Design a protein with these regions (language model features):
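N-terminal hydrophobic targeting signals that begin at the initiator methionine
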Residues: 1-2
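Jelly-roll (double-stranded beta-helix
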Residues: 5-143, 150-208
Length: 208
């Protein structure tokens, strides 16, 4: 091939490559929402439930050993250190208090149900805006207390949202649901469960 013609072809290819680069977006394409993370922090089994309408009482303690001592003295209390604070969670009647603790919230009334054995479970959960769980169900009820961000819960009954510093009581056993981070900042929340201990704590589900 003629050297001049070869040089011309190289020049045309170079111009076309510059044109193609100019068509590329100037900023990266937005990534998919991050992962919704769920961590187990405490659990305890019960043979039976306390009488009367039940609430989750949430309290802060100065030190973890104090909260653990209080939890050891109560069959329906659990202690955990989450998000830089020490927490005591107690399932019981409304209006109670634990010596040495500072009450943060009472969440309820919690839906109750019959079971051969019960499991109290506390999860720490959350994620960036747009993150969500798969559709699932539990053999019991769950309640939420939001530390930061906004939690959303989608069920066949609709969508409920709760902001930081507020609580939300979920539905009873076997309700299909999807939980998501619905705000503009990362979700950080505590999730309190009353479950049938003889069944899997969570199973896949679907919306009909």
């Amino acid at each position: 091939m003629n050297p001049r013609r070869l040089d011309a072809w190289y020049f045309i290819a170079w111009v076309l490559s510059l044109f193609a680069m100019a068509l590329l977006p100037s900023s990266p394409v937005a990534a998919e929402p991050g992962q919704f993370i769920v961590s187990l922090v405490a659990e305890k089994k019960l043979n039976g439930l306390p009488p009367g309408p039940l609430y989750w009482r949430i309290e802060n303690f100065p030190a973890l050993d104090q909260a653990q001592s209080a939890a050891a003295a109560s069959p329906t209390s659990l202690a955990a250190a989450v998000s830089g604070k020490v927490w005591l969670f107690t399932l019981g009647q409304k209006g109670g208090a634990t010596p040495g603790g500072t009450k943060v919230a009472e969440v309820g009334p919690v839906p109750v149900f019959a079971a051969p054995e019960y499991l109290l479970r506390i999860n720490h959960a959350g994620g960036p805006p747009g993150s969500k769980t798969p559709v699932h169900s539990h053999p019991g009820s769950e309640s939420f207390y939001v530390l930061a961000g906004q939690v959303g819960q989608r069920t066949p009954h609709g969508v409920n949202r709760t902001e930081a510093g507020q609580s939300m009581v979920g539905h009873g056993p076997d309700m299909p649901m999807e939980v998501f981070s619905g705000g503009t900042t990362d979700l950080d929340q505590l999730v309190m469960f009353l479950l049938d201990a003889t069944r899997p704590a969570s199973v896949p589900a679907k919306f009909e």
